[in-house]
Amino acid sequence: MDTYMVVGNPIAQSKSPLIHTMFAAQTEQQLEYSRQLLEPGEFDAAAKTFFAGQGKGINITMPFKQDAYNFADELSPRALSAGAVNTLIKREDGSILGENTDGVGLINDITDNLNWTLSGRKVLIVGAGGAVGGILLPLMEQNPAEVLIVNRTASKAEELAARFASMGNIRGAGYGELSAAEGGSCSAFDVIINGTSTSLTGDLPPIPPAVITNTSCVYDMVYGAEPTPFMVWAQNHGAAATADGLGMLVGQAAESFYLWRGIRPDIAPVMAALRQSQ
């Protein structure tokens, strides 16, 4: 039987085995999906052993996305633009393709599930880490009017924006760009995406409420049983809509499943089941 797995550290909390098991049942695919905890330096050996057997694909979570990027024999355009791999695919000739489905998972959630518009909109992205790098190609393909990436280290945001400058109006800056007191513009945005992990620790990124209006749609890549701290903050300052990252998680998993099996699962019942189980 074809086997798949997700690797990371930590990994016990991963919902990927549950998600892919539901996808397999829904689409009547025969497969096994497990999780494996790896220590730093163990990725290459584990992947080689897995693919030498019945292994057909691996999902990769932190901190091994760079290891997977280096392990792949070939990289997709999405993986190249992200600089990271979250999905490995064993092809018919035995070679390994590296893919990144994080960005398409997020964009599909925003445009298809939430029905928010990105085209022609002003978009603020908070953070400039690996999670943000993975979403910029599909985001820029939506033709937003303007994208501003803000990060504690301004140079990191600037470097990230520069990689996608040929695709449209995108720039990077420090958090001070949003503060009138520090000479910034302090303007409002149509869509705000939190790509930091601050909500996991109950914290907030240092951005002013003035970025939100009563038409702003606010997305936190983090998810949980309750609205995240970033969502609550946005709601308290009058945002029109807020969402957490569960749809992104299920969406990137659905894209991985499609790349592996050639069938697109319906994510709606899986989303509903995960919400009920939280």
Curated annotation (Swiss-Prot):
InterPro entries: Aminoacid_DH-like_N_sf, NAD(P)-bd_dom_sf, SDH_C, Shikimate_DH, Shikimate_DH-bd_N, Shikimate_DH_fam, Shikm_DH/Glu-tRNA_Rdtase
Gene3D superfamilies reported for this sequence: Leucine Dehydrogenase, chain A, domain 1, NAD(P)-binding Rossmann-like Domain
Keywords from the named record: Amino-acid biosynthesis, Aromatic amino acid biosynthesis, NADP, Oxidoreductase
Pfam families assigned to the protein according to its UniProt record, in alphabetical order: SDH_C, Shikimate_DH, Shikimate_dh_N
EC number: 1.1.1.25
Pathway it works in: Metabolic intermediate biosynthesis; chorismate biosynthesis; chorismate from D-erythrose 4-phosphate and phosphoenolpyruvate: step 4/7
Cross-referenced CDD domains: NAD_bind_Shikimate_DH
Residues holding shikimate: 14-16, 61, 86, 102, 223
Keyword Oxidoreductase assigned: yes
GO MF: NADP binding; shikimate 3-dehydrogenase (NADP+) activity
Assigned GO CC terms: cytosol
Residues that hold NADP(+) according to the record: 127-131, 151-156, 221, 245
Superkingdom: Bacteria
Catalytic-site annotation from UniProt: 65 (proton acceptor)
Annotated TM spans: none
Family affiliation: Belongs to the shikimate dehydrogenase family.
SUBUNIT field: Homodimer.
The protein's name: Shikimate dehydrogenase (NADP(+))
Source organism phylogeny: Bacteria, Pseudomonadati, Pseudomonadota, Gammaproteobacteria, Cellvibrionales
